[in-house]
Amino acid sequence: MSRSNFSCDAHMFKLKSPYKPTGDQPEAIEKLVAGPAQQVLLGVTGSGKTFTMANVIQTLQKPTLIISHNKTLAAQLYQEFRDYFPENAVSYFVSYYDYYQPEAYIPQSDTYIEKETNINDQIDKLRLAATTNLLTRKDVIVVSSVSCIYNLGSPVEYGKTILELAVGLKITRDQILMRLNDLQYSRSDYSFHRGTYRVRGEIVDICLAYEDSAIRLTHDGAKITKLEKIDPISGTTMNYELKTMNIYPAKHYIAGRDNQAE
């Protein structure tokens, strides 16, 4: 957990629990908060280590990265911290491979084995939601496996590619579609799913890569006239209109046009 001077609002993290720290927990929380930056919390199974750390987050009020040594424990911690902090951006970031077979060569039989992978679509969505939360919020807890140490590309380039939409914005439909392509969204007029968009006249529907919702954009040929959040399956409006909306990349590996030219 970082102890750097991070500017954040008071009571940004709100711990929700019917229980209070008991036994050795209050002393452990106090020492973890006041002690050196690098410490180890030891405890038997069921002693409330996760609850203790939730109280540390509540006290320090700082964005937190929690690294687990495997995906199973990371999933358990993710659910527990979501229960403790239902109003905050608790995110899940682990490897999205259900199966990974690296390429290999067997000299004894002169056999080449091609690389084979199977990506979990739900985990990919949660990974994108984690990085989107880091760009848009301060009250972020990321529960991760060691996959978080690997490079995802430049966060500067990732942030530059954000598509900012607003009702009344003067932009052509073709410019919007070009920017969606830059964000790695693909056009799919007949199979609308996560990370795609479809075009019907002056209406553009965008199925967000990091949420279970979609955005409907209405254009009059010169400017955006309406922004709505819709259900991606039924296409029905989710009861309210938007004034502004930012669209974040559909994939982590993003290169700006200048870098693509190079």
Predicted feature residues:
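ASCE RecA-like P-loop NTPase motor cores
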Residues: S2-E262
